[in-house]
Swiss-Prot record:
GO biological process: protein secretion
Note: DNA conjugation in M.smegmatis is unidirectional with distinct donor and recipient strains; mc(2)155 is a donor strain while MKD8 is a recipient strain. Mutations in a donor strain that alter DNA transfer do not always alter DNA transfer in a recipient strain.
InterPro entries reported for this sequence: EspC
Superkingdom of the source species: Bacteria
Function field: May be involved in assembly of the ESX-1 / type VII specialized secretion system (T7SS), which exports several proteins including EsxA and EsxB. Involved in DNA conjugation, in at least recipient strain.
Family according to the record: Belongs to the EspC family.
Disruption phenotype: Loss of DNA conjugation when disrupted in recipient strain, strain does not secrete EsxB.
Source species of the chain: Mycolicibacterium smegmatis (strain MKD8)
Protein name: Uncharacterized EspC-like protein D806_0056
One Pfam family linked to the record: T7SS_ESX_EspC
Signal sequence, renumbered to the chain: none
Length: 105
């Protein structure tokens, strides 16, 4: 196993895109159950209000967790994209510097 660290901007951008897709899917999944408590109250009437209140509490907790995960994925997407840009600029700058030090034949 090699101890060399190899970083490619393409791989960082690929990982960034995956985090962006994950954030979008998490946002969609988080919203899927919105309104279940209201529907329960509407379809089952006052007898279901205790259950509907419990469902509402679970929905709030689920929404908070989902929103937190979306935020983390979005932040990671941004950080990976920023890192890719920095690696690209560093590679380009150092390549130019190296080209300047090599004497033509």
């Amino acid at each position: 196993m090699s101890d060399d660290l190899r970083v490619t901007t393409a791989h960082l951008r690929e990982l960034s895109a995956k985090q962006g897709r994950a954030a979008a899917e998490l946002a969609t999944a988080t919203a899927v159950v919105d309104g279940v408590d209201t529907a329960l109250r509407f379809t089952h009437g006052p007898i279901s209000w205790g259950t509907a209140a419990a469902v509402e509490a679970v929905q709030h907790a689920r929404r908070a967790a989902g929103t937190g995960m979306v935020k983390v994925s979005q932040e990671l997407e941004t950080k990976l994209d920023t890192a890719a840009g920095r690696y690209h600029r560093t590679d380009s700058t150092m390549g130019d510097a190296l080209d300047e030090t090599i004497q033509p034949r």
